[in-house]
């Protein structure tokens, strides 16, 4: 049962659909005062290597998801208990900010079998060539882009390389 929950495509497809349909310019009514959101984002920014800034579009997206996708986020929080320790171990080994783990939430809704419309696959949404470049075995029989541990190892190496190129974590 738990394995079925971990690979359910429903939350991935729903989340991708919701992301495409969010109108960042449309004000969403939700019981989250703007000043409280600004304060929380500021505290996050102070503790993070990322640049986290308030803007009205971000507020609308956050409120939209809190209002309309509460059940989906509850499922994501449950699934994260399984995957985040794997991600954190790999990221820590490579001195990568642990916040990068949330990239997998955005990319795949934590579904190791997620496949984008352009063929990116797995938790970290590696394209075929990028997966090969980071030594993931991809064939008719196996696709390590869908292996949580191997894909996380490859994602850590990829993030290291991106940091070397760009010099910051706001990739």
Where are these regions (language model features)?
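Substrate-binding clefts and substrate-entry loops adjacent to catalytic sites
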Residues: 61-75, 110-117, 125-168
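An acidic, Gly/Ser/Thr/Pro-rich helix-cap/linker signature
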Residues: 1-94
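Solvent-exposed, polar/charged alpha-helical surfaces in well-ordered, non-transmembrane soluble domains
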Residues: 85, 89, 101, 153-160
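Short, functionally critical alpha-helical segments immediately adjacent to catalytic or ligand/cofactor-binding
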Residues: 96-113, 170
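Membrane-interface junctions
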Residues: 93-96, 165
